[in-house]
Curated annotation (Swiss-Prot):
Belongs to the herpesviridae UL49 family. Disulfide bonds: none annotated. InterPro entries: UL49. It comes from Human cytomegalovirus (strain Merlin) (HHV-5). One of its GO terms (biological process) is viral process. One of its GO terms (cellular component) is viral tegument. The gene is UL49. This is Protein UL49. Pfam families: Herpes_UL49_1 (PF03117).
């Protein structure tokens, strides 16, 4: 069988196999610009045909709105095809078209390679002909070696630093011969997934940090950090239970709680209080540390976090290898809260390149340009019926929230006078201004902070880190005397940044009809200038007679259909 020959393979044969594999797959791989790292974290997971820029506009009109740098990128755009794209797990089946293209490119390298390289690749698994299933298997081995390189050099928390080619070949010797023979004869997603689980103990998932309904961060699932009532503490770089005896006051408190609680299934009130304290701390503190020890994303649960497992770690001898035991569930909840705060959101802060875009405060009030955002699920709740497209999203059954309601609005409880999110049921609903002008004092100097923001239709604001991804946003109207918003379709991050510079803003439907309103600069009533107009008066754009105009073509702008002002007044 295939792995009988593998059992007795010398170490030199393994080295020759590794070197030949790297040489043959190097032309099929993309190494520059940290492409493998981007693929692992989700930025490079798009297929080449999906990543290509498409436009239905005439070339002249499209070039008129595009900068010189972006025009050069579009003209000379070459889709980057990497062999790791073959194992992106966004579909249930391997990409046949991509596999055929890579297989044809590999055969060109295979026909011109040296005879020693052919023997090193085929003799280890007793293959006489380079078939497509065997090519896919070799591509999988090469991809695991690339993940090992990424983990060693850049992302050690992936726990792939010990999964090199030597480790993989050693584990293949223990794989059942009939299953390996079936895999080499015909590679399927099911067989490849079984092999990956046998080798590494986890499901095959690429990108590793992709927001899916079955999140790769298994230690962050709700059923994991909300199902046990342990009291493990972090002591001497390991997780163990408290060894010191309880004080009389603590014993009295526990006894009193037990007497009054009885057998009422009230859960764990102390844990609920601790969760609320951790959530508030993570929301209010800009920086904090979550003690995770050496746990990685691919570590399996050893002992299930039980008391016996935690005690075994605490009493492990110096010569005995201690197993990785999960930290206590409150620490896992803190990690989930930290990831939620860094990944989930629907409001994007934009830089303001010119002060001539400041609005006149005469036409703004406390309810103008306000977005109601849920801090728990990250969705904007006052979009109304506006449909905004975005490819990135954290689905409802992910690790962050668990309810299954599709509408996004605010529920007001008149009995208790509480506000709830209709999507996840959380009470952590906040108001964020899409445009604001705040006066501050820094180091004795009076300063003005300008906030210009964009609102997404989904809760994956981290999609802005992918400069090739197109999405829909809601922006404040570019007119200085308007408190309405516009919907911008199919915008990317480079094009979104140009919308905050002078002369490139989009106007709402009301301003496009020619409705004119005076600002403080045009008013003749002798009233003092507002803060925005006072700053605009000092800009070079105003002195030189600059007039804010609508951006030319390329971006479809429509007024929001939910209300006359895009985002409803709050």
């Amino acid at each position: 069988m295939a792995n009988r020959r593998l059992r007795h393979a010398p170490h030199t044969a393994t080295d020759e196999f590794h070197q030949a594999l790297r040489r043959l797959f190097a032309p099929l791989c993309v190494h520059e610009d940290h492409f493998h790292v981007q693929l692992v974290i989700g930025r490079g997971a798009l297929q080449p045909e999906e990543a290509a820029v498409e436009t239905s506009q005439p070339p002249a009109q499209f070039a008129a709105q595009t900068s010189a740098v972006l025009q050069q990128q579009l003209v000379h755009h070459v889709p980057r095809s990497c062999v790791l794209h073959l194992f992106v797990t966004d579909k249930r089946f391997l990409n046949r078209e991509l596999g055929d293209r890579l297989y044809q490119r590999f055969l060109r390298e295979w026909l011109v390679c040296r005879q020693a390289e052919r023997e090193a690749v085929t003799a280890l698994f007793q293959r006489m002909v380079m078939t497509k299933p065997y090519f896919v298997f070799l591509a999988y081995v090469y991809s695991m070696d690339c993940l090992h390189t990424v983990a060693v050099r850049t992302m050690a928390f992936l726990r792939f630093e010990r999964y090199d080619t030597d480790y993989l070949l050693r584990r293949l010797r223990l794989y059942p011969p009939e299953r390996l023979h079936a895999l080499l004869d015909g590679v399927t997603v099911s067989l490849l997934g079984d092999l990956h689980r046998f080798l590494f103990g986890v499901d095959l998932r690429l990108p590793v940090l992709h927001p899916t309904s079955s999140p790769c961060l298994a230690l962050l699932r709700a059923k994991r950090f909300d199902a046990r009532a342990d009291l493990a503490v972090y002591h001497r770089n390991q997780w163990c239970h408290q060894r010191q005896p309880r004080s009389p006051q603590l014993r009295g408190l526990i006894a009193a709680l037990r007497r009054h609680a009885g057998k009422v299934p009230c859960g764990n009130p102390l844990y609920v209080l601790a969760r609320q304290a951790v959530q508030t701390f993570c929301d209010t503190c800009p920086r904090y540390l979550v003690p995770l020890r050496a746990l990685g994303l691919h570590d399996e649960t050893r002992g299930g976090g039980s008391t016996a497992a935690a005690a075994a770690v605490g009493h492990a001898g110096a010569g005995q290898q201690a197993h990785h035991v999960e930290p206590t569930k409150i620490v896992l909840f803190a990690l989930s809260a930290a990831l939620r705060g860094g990944l989930i959101g629907s409001v994007i802060d934009l830089p303001l390149w010119c002060l001539c875009r400041l609005k006149c405060e005469r036409h703004l009030d406390a309810r103008s340009l306000v977005a109601v955002v849920c801090r728990q699920c990250g969705h904007c709740l006052n979009l109304g019926k506006e449909k905004l497209h975005c490819q990135q999203n954290f689905p409802l059954n992910s690790m962050f929230y668990y309810r299954d309601r599709q509408e996004k609005s605010v529920i007001f409880n008149t009995h208790a006078e509480l506000v709830h999110c209709s999507l996840c049921g959380s009470q952590r609903v906040v108001r964020q201004r899409v445009y604001e002008l705040v006066s501050e004092t820094l180091f004795g100097q009076r300063c003005v902070r300008v906030g210009w923001k964009a609102v997404l239709g989904l809760n994956a604001a981290c999609a802005v880190y992918d400069h090739r991804l197109a999405f829909d946003v809601i922006l404040p109207c570019a007119a200085r005397t308007c408190d309405s918003t516009v919907v911008v379709r199919g915008v990317t991050v480079p094009r979104l940044l140009r919308l905050t510079s002078h002369g490139h803003g989009l106007l709402c439907a009301r301003c496009q009809t020619g409705e004119y309103r005076d600002s403080c600069l045009e008013s003749e009533d002798g009233a003092p200038l507002c803060r925005g107009c006072a700053l605009v008066k000092q800009t070079a754009c105003h002195v030189g007679g600059h007039i804010v105009q609508q951006a030319r073509g390329g971006l479809a702008a429509t007024s929001s259909s939910s209300s006359p002002h895009g985002l409803p007044h709050v």
